[in-house]
Each structure stands twice: as structure tokens, then as C-alpha cells.
Amino acid sequence: MKLALLGRQALMGAMAVVLMAGVSVKTFAAENLLNQVKERGTLRVGLEGTYPPFSFQGDDGKLTGFEVEFANELAKHLGVKADLKPTKWDGMLASLDSKRIDVVINQVTISDERKKKYDFSTPYTISGVQALVKKGNEGAIKTAADLKGKKVGVGLGTNYEEWLRQNVQGVD
């Protein structure tokens, strides 16, 4: 009985060490990235640059929008300059994974799968699934099931594509 209790305590202690090691590694990685950003003097920010009002090219050809302003303020808070890196959505997370960018400031849906790999800020916008149909076609599509057999356009690799594949059979 004492041996079993001792074994459980050892197991719990080992689990605590493993959990703390995970936290320490994550904290170390974040501190390491922050040090790299400060040494470099720039925060490399991935954003699409094609999505008004969040990030887009203004009349002067420069990136502008809410996410651009947010990126500049974040960099200023860190004592560095923002290096804006317009990136197509289908390559955004790969750019983060390969360390071509330091942070993504872009409309990114938080999913359980993504939370396993990435840290997320508090959401600054909330969006849902919407549909747009041609004038005169309003009555033909009222529910997701009405999309069956129809051609539907969604962004490649977006949560909308995932939702469509999971919720509508036979969509093209």
C-alpha cells in the first residue's frame, strides 16, 4: 500500500516536472523571439494587405488599415519598427512556421487544431459564415443544404472551406 502511494507520488512529481518543462520551453521560445526582434530592430508582420478595412493598399500604394495600425503600435510598444510582409493567406501560417515572419496580424480563425500549434491574442473582431448570391437568386438559397450541387467560392485553406466541406455534401 505504501509502495503504491509512493509510486503515485513519484508519477505525479514526474508529471509536474514534464508540465513545467513544457511551460519553460514555451516561455524560453517567446523570450528568445522577443530578443531576436529587439536585436534586429524590426518586428516582421505577416498580413494579407488585400482585405479592407483591415489591411489594404491605399491610394498612395502604401499598406493601410486597422491591422497595419495595430502592427505599428505593437512594434512601437516593443521599441522596434514594424516590417510589414504582405503574404497570401494560403502561405501565411507556413511563413510563421518557417520564421520568415515573427507574428501574424490578420483575420485568423481560432480553432482547436490551430491552438495546439499557435498562441492567439484576444480576438479583436468576430466574424461568422455568410453567403452572397446573385440578384434574383435570393429565394433559391436559404440554408446550407440549398448549396448542394451548386458552385460555391471560398478562400482556399480558410475556415469557410473547412466549414463547407464538413457541413454541405455535394458542393462544387
Task: Identify the residue ranges that each predicted region occupies.
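Bacterial N-terminal signal peptides that target proteins for export
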Residues: 1-14
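Secondary-structure junction motif
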Residues: 153-168
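Ligand-binding "clamshell"
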Residues: 112-123, 169-172
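C-terminal segment of classical bacterial N-terminal signal peptides
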Residues: 17-28
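Short, well-ordered beta-strand segments
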Residues: 44-48, 132, 151-154
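Solvent-exposed loop/turn segments at secondary-structure junctions
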Residues: 50-53, 89-91, 109-113, 137-139, ...
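Extracytoplasmic small-molecule ligand-binding "clamshell" domains
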Residues: 30-107
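Flexible hinge/capping segments at coil-to-helix
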Residues: 134-151
